[in-house]
């Protein structure tokens, strides 16, 4: 029995190191993002009256990206989760327009999705992403998985990382991303 425990622990350690290496290698910005016509801004949990801190960082990154790329259009992705007062994308738009001063004409909405795979599929169905280069903005820990899922959907994305607001959230998020990535690998939906 102890032998089985050691083998399982070794498998966990190897999978954790491999997946964390993938996550960390994907945390960089692609210089080619300059060419992007569309940028998907992936949603995250919202509170009753505002976006979460992690989502605020994504929105600030999106606002900066739009300032630096005057022809780009942002697609705000995110449906309504449990205990959320509205779809994430609606609050994202509200925050960007009201707080950051983003031009509302440059913000499109995808408000039916519940996860990253649905974010991408729904945005692709609504907007001509296959006809143009697109970027994806998400928290740095989430970027590798988001890019791979976009590639699986037939897109050629550039990654633009948003910082994680604090170290405890970063640690918890890396563990959650490990679990999400492992789940996709084990169900055959990754790679």
Q: Which residue stretches match the model-derived regions?
A:
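A structural signal for short, hydrophobic/glycine-enriched beta-strand patches
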Residues: 20-174
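A transmembrane-helix-recognition feature enriched in membrane-embedded lipid enzymes
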Residues: 171-190
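Hydrophobic membrane-insertion alpha-helices, especially the h-region
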Residues: 5-20
């Amino acid at each position: 029995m102890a032998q089985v425990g050691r083998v399982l622990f070794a498998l966990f350690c190897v999978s954790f190191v491999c997946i964390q290496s993938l996550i960390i290698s994907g945390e960089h910005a692609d210089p080619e993002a300059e060419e992007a016509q569309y940028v998907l801004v992936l949603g995250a949990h919202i509170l009753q009256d505002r976006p979460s801190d992690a989502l605020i960082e994504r929105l600030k990154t999106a606002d900066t990206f739009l300032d630096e790329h005057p022809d780009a259009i942002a697609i705000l992705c995110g449906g309504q989760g449990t205990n959320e007062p509205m779809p994430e994308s609606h609050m994202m738009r509200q925050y960007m327009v009201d707080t950051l001063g983003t031009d509302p004409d440059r913000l499109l909405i995808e408000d039916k999705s519940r996860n990253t795979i649905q974010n991408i599929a729904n945005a692709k169905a609504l907007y001509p992403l296959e006809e143009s280069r697109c970027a994806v903005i998400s928290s740095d820990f989430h970027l590798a998985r988001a890019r791979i899922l976009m590639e699986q959907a037939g897109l050629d994305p550039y990654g633009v990382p948003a910082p994680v607001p604090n170290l405890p959230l970063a640690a918890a998020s890396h563990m959650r991303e490990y679990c999400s990535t492992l789940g996709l690998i084990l169900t055959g939906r990754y790679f």
